[in-house]
Swiss-Prot record:
Gene3D superfamilies: ZPR1, A/B domain, ZPR1, zinc finger domain. It comes from Schizosaccharomyces pombe (strain 972 / ATCC 24843). Belongs to the ZPR1 family. One of its GO terms (cellular component) is nucleus. A zinc finger (C4-type) spans 38-70, 259-291. Keywords: Chaperone, Cytoplasm, Metal-binding, Nucleus, Repeat, Zinc, Zinc-finger. InterPro entries: Znf_ZPR1, ZPR1, ZPR1_A/B_dom, ZPR1_jr_dom, ZPR1_Znf1/2. PANTHER family: ZINC FINGER PROTEIN ZPR1. It comes from the Eukaryota. Its main location: cytoplasm. This is Zinc finger chaperone zpr1.
Amino acid sequence: MAEEKKEELFTSIGNAAQNVSTAEDREGNGVQEVESLCMECGKNGTTKLLLTVIPYFREVVLMSFECPHCGFKNAQVQHAETIQPEGSKITFHVEDKEDLNRTVVKSQEAIVSIPEIQLEIPGRLGQLTTIEGILSNVVDDLSKEQESRKESAPQLYDQINAFIEKVNSLRSGSVPFTITVDDITGNSWIEMKPGRDGDRWSQVSYKRTLEQNTKLGLVDTDQPEDVKTQTNNASNTLKHDATAVEVDPNEVHTFHATCPSCSHQCDTHMKLLDIPHFKEVIIMSTVCDRCGYRSNEVKTGGEIPPKGRKITLKVMDAEDLSRDILKSETASLKIPELGLDLFPGTLGGRFTTIEGLLAQVYDELYGRVFSQETDSMTPEQVANWQQFLCNLTAAREGATQFTLILDDPLSQSYLQNYYAPDPDPNMTIEEYERSFQVNEELGLNDMKTENYEKDGGKK
């Protein structure tokens, strides 16, 4: 019954636009109108509310306010769904003017940054906009008081004008740049296009800190200080406990930890697994009975190899889909025939089969990006998504041959060799020297592993 009521309230933008009329508005269907106070002039204006489903994303409430007395207008978006179990950071590299039309869903907690011009937009009102719309808002906000600054603070006026010119150069589409949306609620999104973005679009999920959970109201601020301290140090306690206990590969060890979603205590289960012809890895699973959060991770250990490793496998039939695969957090995965390109960090660490990994990719893309509500997509976009998902389904069912490329700069990933210890005729393994930039991103350039005790004691 609750689900049916929810479906009645939330309709797609296209359906709402087709069905809304003046009579329906008065009855509370479609767009709803509410009289509300104007914060500019103090008189009453009108707020319009639309409960809708964004095809690229999830259910939201679109709000638009207009005051007939002073002409003030305002629009914002609020999420109607719950806070996600993890935060998310989405990065997209803009190359041309067409990319500026990408849809952006930005929650009120999201921080937008463009490193090329050292721009960071803090969280404020939620927005349903485009990349160009975000840049336009920046220009509008900076231009508001420019006339008064020209007389009172000419130096500041010139500095802001110079920055506005930089933003306008990005708006023209002639200068490539990178935009990042970091949202601790996990409720923000940048539109992606399958088979076209390559390595330009990436998403990384992360666990929230205690401070972030407190900001979102997920932690009881009235709890004793010692409980907060215990919660804040739970992850460190888990690490110390894991290293202090002798791990038996035949047992599942359980440690007390903290749920990254609601910050309440829960149990983390850990098991040591020996992968033949590879190394020992740790599989960790967390389940929170309070909020239902679930997480499965694979951690590899040992020293960092001097070289990276790229594994290429020709998947010939359904039998190859049963091969075990360990994709570490630092590994990227590509399937050129499908136009599939997963950045390092996507899906986290996973130990499964090729079929299982493709199923996870399908579920993530279909549930997160593509849905049956495709009214805001162009026919070409719908066709591209349908073809991409169809090809992905054929690959996971063994109906088509493809090439799987697993590239890990830390050599912490694994792909099962059916012929081990002999070479696999359909698999090639290449070792390569990591570039300075890759080592910089991994934090290896400044890492000191020898005589650090002596250097640490210098004053």
